[in-house]
Amino acid sequence: MLSKRWDTAGRWCIYALLLIVFVGPFWGIVATAFSGAPVKPGELLAWPHQFSLENFIFAWMDIGVWQYLLNSILVVFFGTVLQVSVSALAAYALARKKFRGVALVSLVILSTMMLPEEVIAISLYMIINWRLPLIDASLYNSYLGMILPVVGWAFSIFVLTEFMSAIPKELEEAARIDGANEWQIFFHVILPLVKPALGTVVTFGFIMIWDQYLLPLIVVNQDSLNTIPVILGTLRTDESITPNIFIAITLLAMLPSIIVYLGLQKHFNRGIMSGAVKG
């Protein structure tokens, strides 16, 4: 009986330690952001000194963080929608259609996952600066310049292809017998069955686009078009910005990703678990 109590107590001590390790840094960010006075390293886990919203007000009004957040939201919204749409169509073709060279196409798409952004930075810059013949303008210094390069993400295509490949062909054949065309099969048969994978792809895609730093740095040189990761990198070396204000901006930058993850957590977890079971 005594050993069981010690076992329970030890287990709860481990849980408490893990809670401090994982929640402690986030609480340190919150405490610093809401503190009106400078926070010392030893006080990161304490309650905020002089609880105040001045850091957020200064960041929102004086620095204009709202505009950088709006830029990021626009880029991530349209980027995620286009990315998921293109990935779903590409995955449907690779998983459900048999054509010559399908293995080669899949290999080429997957090989792009092995290339870091730094390798293609110069090529991407040159492509973005090409002047389009119809409009006599380039994608440089535009939202499209930040959106289009993230549309074709090999990871999204790979995940959706694996899920679509596992769908029994009998369902597709039954839909064809009932008179369904290709688009009806795609929207009403295939997509509903891969909702968990879509949740996973949307979550990862959102976070990937939201955290983009190098891409906006390459294709944008106007401050009014900068995204929140770029402005965070700029303010990090600005001596006029106090650590409290910088942490407040960091907290604002974290909120959209947290909200999206919590909103899609059910589908995200199902997608991860389904992939684990299949593997």
Give the label of every model feature segment.
Residues 2-279:
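A structural signal for multi-pass alpha-helical bundles of membrane permease subunits
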